[in-house]
């Protein structure tokens, strides 16, 4: 263990955080204004304040914090879409191999976000697409809210009056610019288990953006709706059918406190193997890995890569009936509230592993080990390295050198 007891600060009184701090013998800062901490698990608002140049706060080499300064470039729904569209154009311009398409003209590696428009900026584009597919269902979400708040399904343009006022001819005429929205093509053919819709919550830990280094947690889970899935228009407003958020589902009469409407990721993978076969299940999870890497790369150049920062993202992935995964959203502050014994065990181990990566046991013994990206391990608990750009470049350089040596031997034999 570290030779000196470390101090922590947290804005969240969640047992999975505080119990893990206590287990490592760390001391909690007693006052909310106490800045003598080594690790701070903060709200996104306090992180923004800390990195605001006007705050006058300067973190020292022995301080790390759980968000990058402009994390919202990835975790705000509208900015996530905007940044990925920009990144896709950059790859196309470079004629990147990631832009390969199948025989139907669909991207092999970049087609994982449902068609999405931002409102009010892309309202006209949305209307054009809406009229091209008049029978499609769309889902409308506030860009910066979470836990399913403010979400509704849409089949008629006039339904946008819910968020913008306006008239039937122009529902966004009086749209408030105080809050942005996204409207996405609703995935109306989700894979069902027992007739119910579900999505996956998968955790990814980023310790550096340049070079990109990301760990993937093996023990995610599926979140289930409590009601049987249907496309019946009469049930469009029934969020117990359409939204998997626990914050929504816990109000259903069918909600179980025992399991919290969750299945382990391993159980869901076994289910996929049983229904689709091992090869398709493996491809599905390979595609999920690709989604995580490509989404992070889409903001790699614009995230402020402060060495004091790390970020644990909660990815929400929906699998359709063709075993194709779709990225629904990325959460900067995935819920650490526990919904039962198994959920508590999973999240306790999750946070324990995060601490082991960002502050390894020798972190305080070695003055050269500062910042959140000091661990050299490829596996820590249930976290495994998903992508290590520095290592990838090193291997690439070694392969290029080997190729040069081979060429030299061929020429000078």
Curated annotation (Swiss-Prot):
Q: Where does ATP bind?
A: 184-187, 197, 199
**Keyword entries, A-Z:** ATP-binding, Cell projection, Cilium, Cytoplasm, Cytoskeleton, Ligase, Microtubule, Nucleotide-binding, Vacuole
| TTL domain mapped to chain residues | 2-370
Q: One Pfam match, by short name?
A: TTL
Q: Which GO terms describe its cellular component?
A: ciliary basal body; contractile vacuole; microtubule
Q: What is its main location?
A: cytoplasm
Q: Where in the cell is it found?
A: Cytoplasm, Cytoskeleton; Cytoplasm, Cytoskeleton, Cilium basal body; Contractile vacuole
Q: Which PROSITE patterns match?
A: TTL (PS51221)
Write down the top EC class of this protein.
Answer: ligase
Keyword ATP-binding included in the entry's annotation: yes
Q: What EC number(s) are associated with this protein in UniProt?
A: 6.-.-.-
Quick one: a GO biological-process term for this protein?
A: protein polyglutamylation
Its recorded name reads: Probable alpha-tubulin polyglutamylase Ttll1
Record the organism: Tetrahymena thermophila (strain SB210)
Kindly list the organism's lineage.
Eukaryota, Sar, Alveolata, Ciliophora, Intramacronucleata
Name of the gene encoding the protein in the UniProt record? Ttll1
